[in-house]
């Protein structure tokens, strides 16, 4: 049983374990240690790695905002739509873009199925059969939805209890802590309260009612895809405020606000370097993409000709709580700035927890 808690970094879960009785009991009964996330440290990249067992270069899902040359568009990969029209969710699919051809490596579900192990995925109801689920979970045996936290834990318990005589891998994803951390900032009262409710549901709706026979031989894994770092409004860099920087770029930055992929105009490399050094020293690091690839930042594989255009010429990596946004204009109902974010390489973003505990031992 793998429960993935979006944006719950290693330090966050460790601190909660000092106060929460359920988590403290699990920590004492199991094994708990930090892992490093993928780069960029963001959900779509990490979930694809979890469900394929491949590094980002191995599966090709390299960021939240990507240039797709075959479609001639910069796409928002959460909405699966052009960035300029991301409100038209999944419009790429209407153009004939196929999720199964975007990530082509075999999925975890297929490998487990070949070994006689069934897989069940629990995710938010609107995501059960959407385009992203067709990427992440395309080989899963069953996809089941939930409405909220309570039925997530109940559905998870029922799935485990019904499969006592079978080998089973079940994965549940919960994203509320990530959403609250984006809006209010990480490690705030809002995100801490949400995480306490996660643990309360784990105890009351999953662990306590789970029959002893279902606990036997069941391993619970609690993990996360990435952490978050505070990104205060005063640390935002708006590209629209830097026309000289805009002039050096062929396209708007892609990737992540804290790990941007830059496509540079011919003859503008030195101008770009000078501008970043003069205006963003101590806030961003400019790194040639080829150097990042050689260093294995995206994984040990070499990029295929189809993947390399997705990465641009340079990476702009945030060092502190900065982020690079295109403009100050936001849609109606959106917060002016996300006060927590991820994507870069700081410990708060990259260190994630793994708690492993046998349920017949608690």
Q: Each predicted region: which residue ranges?
A:
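Feature captures the catalytic ectodomains and active-site-proximal regions of enzymes
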Residues: 1-362
